[in-house]
Swiss-Prot record:
It catalyses: N(6)-[(R)-lipoyl]-L-lysyl-[glycine-cleavage complex H protein] + glycine + H(+) = N(6)-[(R)-S(8)-aminomethyldihydrolipoyl]-L-lysyl-[glycine-cleavage complex H protein] + CO2. GO terms for biological process: glycine decarboxylation via glycine cleavage system; nucleoside metabolic process. This is Probable glycine dehydrogenase (decarboxylating) subunit 1. NCBIfam families: PRK00451.1. The gene is gcvPA. The glycine cleavage system catalyzes the degradation of glycine. The P protein binds the alpha-amino group of glycine through its pyridoxal phosphate cofactor; CO(2) is released and the remaining methylamine moiety is then transferred to the lipoamide cofactor of the H protein. It is an enzyme of class 1 (oxidoreductase).
Length: 448
């Protein structure tokens, strides 16, 4: 190039045309019919000075509603949590700043160790034997868990609670469409928890797995011990989609006999933003280790006895055994997994426990305030979400709340007509008493 920073100067163009034997750009495109050529300049504005452009873009961006400008009570799978400042500082290091595991992985011992630590932290939270290096998001992890269950048990039916996130169920049904022999049976709710009688009746010897969410989509905590008792003698797998932050306080699924625990680590160090990215986790037992999708990092020793890390059990993966792979997914969210690892490490076991307790306390306070205001709050032991019934459409209420710089809860009417005019409200450790009181007060005024 004739200029170090500006490509395609007139001199560059002439040199390229001369090299290929064309006299002009018009001659270069001479084979294109003239009636479809645009014989004028594009109708776009001239370039702007950087300062002018930044001012204009900032004006446009200021129209956005964000958790920095508004108080958010929106959850439904994506939550407004505290992320330690060290997270962004660490993941911005050039050694880490990529979403991919390297294709010559053993060269990058630091990155492999970081992934190994993520796997270890997930195992500790879930009380499981092994975890993979991450997946795209929790819903992908859930669908892959169901596919593993079909493969392991050689059965064709999976029983799932309607208390699972509705989009997780949509992903599962998308997977099932490509496997016509698979049957997905959805179990109704009893209030905001799974109807255990219907669940027990649906589980039979043809059931590959039973899947529930913990806490479930409606914020209620399912009875994992009782659910597991229904499937013990059916040789079906027990899949639990769990909020990892809640596991800092709740008894982990592994202690209830779960075979696979999946979820999304977004509550740890990953900002709430429309469309992601997220970070799915996938944890299971040693028995199912060789069927786990995605990458696994293992600890080993080199010839000199030094600790080292490797990608292990790679024969499971589609880049090794494409026709017999346990999954078509090898990519992962290594950068977000690192962010979650840093957040968990910075908080520590006690810190995660403390934040989980704050979520429960703040949510319960908000519940009581709504009840005092005369709202119907649906029954259920909850973590940081609960359901409130309104007299008016939720969309209308939320549109009005925005005027008071409040982002309201999720409109459950989108999911089911049974929950028309019901709002799913998330109250995390970041919400203050004043913010909760203001939200309840304005919601009461708008509901009159």
């Amino acid at each position: 190039m004739s200029h170090r920073y500006i490509p395609l100067t007139e001199k560059d163009k002439q040199e390229m045309l001369q090299t290929i034997g064309a006299k002009s750009i018009g001659e270069l495109f001479g084979d294109v019919p003239s009636d479809i050529l645009l014989n004028r300049d594009l109708n776009i504005a001239e370039g702007e000075a950087e300062t002018t452009l930044l001012r204009r873009l900032n004006r446009i961006a200021s129209k956005n509603i964000t958790k920095e400008t508004h108080t958010s009570f929106l959850g439904a799978g994506v939550y407004d949590h505290y992320a330690p400042s060290v997270v962004d500082a660490m993941i911005s290091r050039s050694e880490f700043y990529t979403a991919y595991t390297p294709y010559q992985p053993e060269i990058s011992q630091g990155e492999l160790q970081a992934i190994f630590e993520f796997q270890t932290l997930i195992c500790e939270l879930t009380d499981m034997d092994v975890a993979n290096s991450s997946m795209y998001d929790g819903m992908t992890s859930f669908a892959e868990a169901c596919i593993l269950a079909f493969s392991q048990t050689k059965k064709n039916k999976i029983v799932v609670s309607k208390g699972l996130h509705y989009q997780a169920l949509q992903v599962l049904h998308t997977y099932a469409k490509t496997r016509k022999e698979f049957e997905v049976v959805e179990i109704d709710l009893d209030g905001t928890v799974t109807d255990l009688k219907k669940l027990e009746a649906a589980v039979d010897d043809e059931t590959a797995a039973v899947a529930v969410q913990y806490p479930n989509f409606y914020g209620s905590i399912e009875d994992l011990e009782k659910i597991h008792s229904f499937i013990e003698d059916k040789k079906a797998l027990f899949i639990v989609y769990a909020n990892p932050l809640a596991l800092g306080l709740l008894t982990p699924p592994g202690s209830f006999g779960a075979d696979i625990v999946v979820g999304d680590t977004q509550p740890f160090g990953i900002p709430a933003q429309f469309g992601g990215p997220h970070c799915g986790y996938f944890a299971t037992t040693k028995k199912l280790m060789r069927k786990v999708p995605g990458r696994l990092v293992g600890q080993t020793q080199d010839d000199e006895g030094n600790r080292g890390f490797v990608l292990t059990l790679q024969a499971r993966e589609q880049h090794i055994r494409r026709d017999k792979a346990t999954s078509n997914i090898c990519s992962n969210q290594a950068l977000n997994a690192l962010a979650s690892s840093i957040a968990m490490s910075a908080l520590g076991k006690q810190g995660i426990y403390d934040i989980a307790v704050q979520n429960i306390e703040h949510a319960n306070y908000a519940k009581q305030q709504f009840i005092k205001k005369g709202f119907e709050v649906l029954d259920g032991t909850s973590f940081n979400e609960f359901v409130v019934k309104f007299d008016k459409p939720i969309q209308q209420v939320n549109e009005e709340l925005v005027k008071y710089n409040i982002i309201g809860g999720f409109d459950l009417g989108v999911v089911s007509d049974d929950f028309k005019n019901h709002m799913l409200i998330a109250v995390t450790e970041l919400r203050t008493k004043d913010e909760i009181d203001t939200f309840v007060e304005k919601a009461g005024e708008l509901n009159d």
